[in-house]
Amino acid sequence: NLGRLGFLSENRPSAVASAILSGEYTVENRAMLKADVHTGNPELDEFPYALNEFTVHRSGAAMLGVEVSLDGVQLPTYWADGLIVSTSSGSTAYSLSAGGPIVLPESKVLIISPIAPHNLNVRPLVVPDNTEIRLRMHSRDENVIYTADNRTAVIPSGAEVGISVAQFSLKRVRLNRSNFIDALTEKLFWGED
């Protein structure tokens, strides 16, 4: 990501080459998510992984009910436009826009963030990254929109999705002179009136 807001873009492209050549970098591991779901979309079924998040979203006007279980323990049903399950890297992506917390990238957690929840007392939930998350959607609409980062598929409203941390991670170069807090300050204009 070389965009303005993407937090993986805290390294300026012009600075990367010289820092790598001079050894002024570290390699960090970023957790990836894996989904257990059949979407009918070969791109998603053959590579069921995401760096930032998986989302389920209503496909029409009817509200989406999402039953969530954490290691087999059932949570109250989320009634919302949708639900996001993100990594700590994804905490500054869609989850942040939906009111989720900012999480330092080295944190070993997953974030469950409702999208426009019907009940105002429903809040994002942070769970350990070794948690097995299962989602079951139901809606009066026939289908649900499912995404893995920016890849999209339509799945039946009764579908179930299992989400866990992948057995591999994304290797990312971080320049020694860059840090996440400075990137937050710069990109979110913290401290500016």
Regions found by a protein language model. Give the residues of each.
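ATP/nucleoside-binding phosphotransfer catalytic cores, i.e., glycine-rich phosphate-binding loops
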Residues: 43, 48, 56, 71-74, ...
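A generic structural signal for short beta-strands and their flanking turns/coil linkers
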Residues: 29-33, 50-52, 62-66, 81-83, ...
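Catalytic core of DAGKc-family lipid kinases
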Residues: 4-81
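Gly/Ser/Thr-rich active-site loops/lids in small-molecule metabolic enzymes
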Residues: 77-121
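Glycine-rich beta-alpha junction loops
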Residues: 37, 58, 87-91, 116, ...
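Short glycine-/acidic-enriched loop or helix-start segments at secondary-structure transitions
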Residues: 8-9, 95-97, 122, 173
